[in-house]
Swiss-Prot record:
Interacts with KATNB1 and KATNBL1. Its EC number is 5.6.1.1. Its main location: cytoplasm. One of its GO terms (molecular function) is ATP binding. SUPFAM superfamilies: P-loop containing nucleoside triphosphate hydrolases (SSF52540). The gene is KATNAL1. It catalyses: n ATP + n H2O + a microtubule = n ADP + n phosphate + (n+1) alpha/beta tubulin heterodimers. This is Katanin p60 ATPase-containing subunit A-like 1.
Length: 490
């Protein structure tokens, strides 16, 4: 980016504004604002980036003032009252003595005459305060014969509130608060929806909350966590992986692994599903994908977890594929290819890591499979893992001294992590069910807390296992293992 060109365009924009050539001035202002925006994306130093954003904000204010001048001049040509002279004297405040004659009392009440005076006066004070910069000094010649409640006044007041909001956002960021993403160019509702429904900071899921899966934890540490701790090492050919695909049966802990990665790295966590990135309006889905990755780069370091990615980016070229679905897939592939993480000259601490999970890896598009460089298998828990899962799920429940969790772990072979959680939940409710059996509503309400806190016994688990069967078949496991032999990259 040529900084001299930025300075030259800003200078020309101000000169044209001072000479009264407002159309050319607005063109130069738009160009320099876009140049600064692109330059800010390439700046890595937060202090320097903040200064550039402050310069861009000042130029935006000047640009808005030029637009206000053009709007005022156009209004003079269209609806200027012919009976009252236009005064060009520059005054910081409006004097009620020089206002046009009041309208008849039957048309407007006196309180309504004075209300615009209270609203317009702070705006003129704000315009006078920033008049020292660039062409803003020419923004003061305003007709005193204007009607106080025109649409132009409302637009000016709205712009003043928006500019004040932007300044408050920047001041908050300088005070150490979380900066807010500037969604210029996007629909405000789309930005707010992604902020509200997707962004999850500090998920608070740690490695200790996940039983077993040591190989998967080791690979995820190497792919995501270690580049944050050792940025100087992971450069060049050792750059971090662009993306990781987690493959396995349902309920094996893929989502929890992604949240643990975000917690251990201290990154912003984006939990994305197919419903998040789809819209009934043409072109909106592609915008959502692009907006998601721009927000991820803004809040970097970031972890984007795309759950059930086969529903978003299934194999292209099939007979039942729709044009809109193909466009979304293409945009997703382009954005993922642009999120290179830490390339040779990039900062690994600003990387965007893409994690994906699927239960149907054989339906994923080949181009997406290439971009997800690491493809790991999340299997069913082993005997040791099942025992750890039982301990984690039952750590808040009182257990009978005679119960042996290792024996129960042997009986639940083939159960997924979610199945084991359901077994523990059902077993912990058995004592309560026996206690309230045959009681009426009033008697149940009268029970004390101590009467319900009965220890979980081995018999409770036996009853729960009779009611809950495993959800993954041997044929499904064979399909996963066959796919990993052909396409796995652990």
């Amino acid at each position: 980016m040529n900084l001299a060109e930025i300075c030259d365009n800003a200078k020309k924009g101000r000169e044209y504004a001072l000479l009264g050539n407002y159309d050319s001035s607005m063109v130069y202002y738009q160009g320099v604002i876009q140049q600064i925006q692109r330059h800010c994306q390439s700046v890595r130093d937060p202090a320097i980036k903040g200064k550039w954003q402050q310069v861009r904000q000042e130029l935006l204010e000047e640009y808005e003032q030029v637009k206000s001048i053009v709007s005022t001049l156009e209004s003079f040509k269209i609806d200027r009252p012919p009976d009252f002279p236009v005064s060009c004297q520059d005054e910081p405040f409006r004097d009620p003595a020089v206002w046009p004659p009041p309208v008849p009392a039957e048309h407007r009440a006196p309180p309504q005459i004075r209300r615009p005076n209270r609203e317009v006066r702070p705006l003129r004070k704000e315009m006078a305060g920033v008049g020292a910069r660039g062409p803003v000094g020419r923004a003061h010649p305003i007709s005193k014969s204007e009607k106080p409640s025109t649409s132009r006044d409302k637009d000016c007041r709205a712009r003043g509130r928006d500019d004040k909001g932007r300044k408050n956002m920047q001041d908050g960021a300088s005070d150490g608060e979380m900066p807010k993403f500037d969604g210029a160019g996007y629909d405000k509702d789309l930005v707010e929806a992604l902020e509200r429904d997707i962004v999850s900071r500090n998920p608070s899921i740690h490695w200790d909350d996940i039983a077993d899966l040591e190989e998967a934890k080791k690979l995820l540490r190497e792919a995501v966590v270690l580049p944050m701790w050792m940025p100087d090492f992971f450069k060049g050919i050792r750059r971090p992986w662009k993306g990781v695909l987690m493959v396995g049966p349902p309920g094996t802990g893929k989502t929890m692994l992604a949240k643990a990665v975000a917690t251990e790295c201290g990154t912003t966590f984006f939990n994305v599903s197919s419903s998040t990135l789809t819209s009934k309006y043409r072109g909106e889905s592609e915008k959502l994908v692009r907006l998601l990755f721009e927000m991820a780069r803004f809040y970097a370091p970031t972890t984007i977890f795309i759950d059930e990615i086969d529903s978003i980016c299934s194999r292209r070229g099939t007979s039942d594929e729709h044009e809109a679905s193909r466009r979304v897939k293409s945009e997703l592939l382009i954005q993922m290819d642009g999120v290179g993480g830490a390339l040779e000259n990039d900062d690994p601490s600003k990387m965007v890591m893409v994690l994906a999970a699927t239960n149907f890896p054989w339906d994923i598009d080949e181009a997406l499979r290439r971009r997800l460089e690491k493809r790991i298998y999340i299997p069913l828990p082993t005997a040791k893992g099942r025992a750890e899962l039982l301990k984690i799920n039952l750590r808040e429940v009182e257990l009978d001294p005679d119960i042996q969790l290792e024996d129960i772990a042997e009986k639940i072979e083939g159960y997924s992590g979610a199945d084991i959680t359901n077994v523990c939940r059902d077993a912990s409710l058995m004592a309560m069910r026996r206690r309230i059996n045959g009681l009426g509503p009033e008697e149940i309400r009268a029970l004390s807390k101590e009467e319900l806190q009965m220890p979980v016994t081995k018999g409770d688990f036996e009853l729960a296992l009779k009611k809950i069967a495993k959800s993954v078949s041997a044929a499904d496991l064979e399909k996963y293992e066959k796919w990993m032999v052909e396409f796995g990259s652990a």
